[in-house]
Amino acid sequence: MSDSEEESQDRQLKIVVLGDGASGKTSLTTCFAQETFGKQYKQTIGLDFFLRRITLPGNLNVTLQIWDIGGQTIGGKMLDKYIYGAQGVLLVYDITNYQSFENLEDWYTVVKKVSEESETQPLVALVGNKIDLEHMRTIKPEKHLRFCQENGFSSHFVSAKTGDSVFLCFQKVAAEILGIKLNKAEIEQSQRVVKADIVNYNQEPMSRTVNPPRSSMCAVQ
């Protein structure tokens, strides 16, 4: 195999998404992996598995294996096995639900236990979801950032509903795992709202203005 063939090979990363039920984990992963947003809440039983390939600076192709872990698995026998081997862990909470933030301590305790047993240290990111509901926020950004600083987490705020910063979150996590620095232009481009309308043929489409231009919501409302 030539050097060029080796260089063109994909890197693969296992990213595990943890947090309470209804924190928006599945909406977050589907918005990223499938560019859709489901209006109806459907509880994840066990886990869901998603794949998406992205390109990082230097034309590095990276396939993200995203493990969306059901919120009810905390304390379950399989949780350790789901986390094992992950290069990245996303701790997701709902910024309007204080308990979902408090319970991340329990999720992180399991991550630390698995890390100690496997002698590997995944990158851990704290993800505040549902920023489209800023007016209902119950967890102040300062508390979020303090939790990050105390534990060495990377910090992210996203909206799975609008797509705001969803791609950027996964992109930054993958880049940080691989030691790649994103420049300002790449970050700004990834912050754009994901274009991923859900088509419902039983309803008349509604027009809406979205900023920035030429982008749209992960859900049609």
UniProtKB/Swiss-Prot annotation:
GO biological process: intracellular protein transport
EC number(s) per entry: 3.6.5.2
Chain residue ranges for the region called Switch I: 35-49
Catalytic activity as recorded in UniProt: GTP + H2O = GDP + phosphate + H(+)
Annotated membrane topology: Lipid-anchor
Pfam families named in the record: Ras
Keyword flag rRNA-binding: no
Co-factor requirement: Mg(2+)
Sites where the protein binds GTP: 21, 24-27, 38-39, 41, 44, 71, 129-130, 132, 160-161
Modified positions (Cysteine methyl ester) in chain numbering: 218
Lipid anchor positions (S-farnesyl cysteine): 218
Annotated InterPro entries: P-loop_NTPase, Small_GTP-bd, Small_GTPase
Chain intervals for the UniProt region annotation (Switch II): 68-85
Regulation of its activity: Regulated by guanine nucleotide exchange factors (GEFs) which promote the exchange of bound GDP for free GTP. Regulated by GTPase activating proteins (GAPs) which increase the GTP hydrolysis activity. Inhibited by GDP dissociation inhibitors (GDIs).
Assembly notes: Interacts (prenylated form) with PDE6D; the interaction promotes RAB28 delivery to the photoreceptor outer segments. Interacts with KCNJ13; the interaction may facilitate cone outer segments phagocytosis. Interacts with RELA; the interaction contributes to RELA transport from cytoplasm to nucleus.
Family of the protein in this entry: Belongs to the small GTPase superfamily. Rab family.
PANTHER family documented for this protein: PTHR47978
Protein name listed in UniProt: Ras-related protein Rab-28
Organism name: Homo sapiens (Human)
